[in-house]
Amino acid sequence: KVTSSIETIYKMLEELKEQVFEANLQLVKYGLVVLTWGNVSGIDRNKGLFVIKPSGVPYDDMKASDMVVMDLEGNKVEGNLNPSSDTPTHLELYRNFDNVGAVVHTHSPWACSWAQAGRDVNAYGTTHADFANCAIPCARGLSEEEVKGEYELNTGKVIVEEFEQRGIKPEECPAVLIHRHGPFTWGKDPFKAVENALILEEVSKMAYQTEQIASLDNDSNIGIEQYLLDKHYQRKHGKNAYYGQSK
């Protein structure tokens, strides 16, 4: 029975490693990363372990077996390579956002542009409302002390702080920007987290273009009414959601 249990755990981790590997490749497929600028992780909460991309390894050279297994204390459990340098950020999100099953970090250009400007991505239409029920928050930049200290861990702490201060539930807004840095997204699994990174990039682009068009006519009357935002969010994600097919 002990052997069977170990084999089951091993099989589940191998499946998670494959998912995380494939999700990392999706970042390239969807144009969300260049070079090695990005990472995906996924967690098995029952086992208290998560899997993350190795640091600085080109996507073309990666294999599923290269994925690194970590525990929730930040210790490497399995893998020959070093984990992503952003691992402490992922870990802090897993520790604080109980329903998150996977985390993505990219430097996708549209989302990064808003982050570098220190701006929230405001909700201007129903495309955004289908994704989140509020503006995508841009968390504060890190202090010099935070940067010189445990930088990546403190990045995660700033994200958690931002959501707590604004009263935002991570399930209702699966994305955040870090001022002067870039975006993080999350989801129930690695593929959903990547999907959310792709949607964030699209709504970031739309928001910029909306502001540019509105500025031509000095039109400040842009934005989505709360009742319309609520309708679109709830019909897709709410208790009585009816978007899509019955499961």
What are these regions (language model features)?
Residues 5-247:
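Glycine-rich flexible loops
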